[in-house]
Amino acid sequence: FLIDEYQVYEARLAGADAILLIAEILDDRRLRALRECAESLGMAALVEFHDPANLPRVLDSGASLVGVNNRDLHEFKTDLEQTLRLRDRIPPEVVLVSESGIRNRADVERLERAGVSAILVGETLMRSPDIGRAVEDLLGLTAGSVSE
């Protein structure tokens, strides 16, 4: 995640196609400025939040790619329902990304049925002894599923 315009330029020079902005750590002005800077350089800006109180700020920033972090970064607990509770409050033209707490194909299918456009998976893949197989399981390309 980035907090300064200089980092956006560095990311682009390093070949990045997208950046992550976390609403909880950026004020309104900086959130909009960083998003606009990234987009002016041809990069996508994934604007993430956890606290529902930040959703209006995220949308007001002009974000078209919005991530709901299912992990409470204060307590480090995950709750997949966070995305599902907020889905109807996010306009359909906004690309919705569900982040964290996605453990298996059933979770992916629940999110798909709810209209989530994309997922961000980290811990499940990093804990797997075979990351390729774990990705296949999440995508439903194998008969098995990713275990918890």
Regions found by a protein language model. Give the residues of each.
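Charged helix-capping and loop-helix junction motifs
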Residues: R32, D79-R85
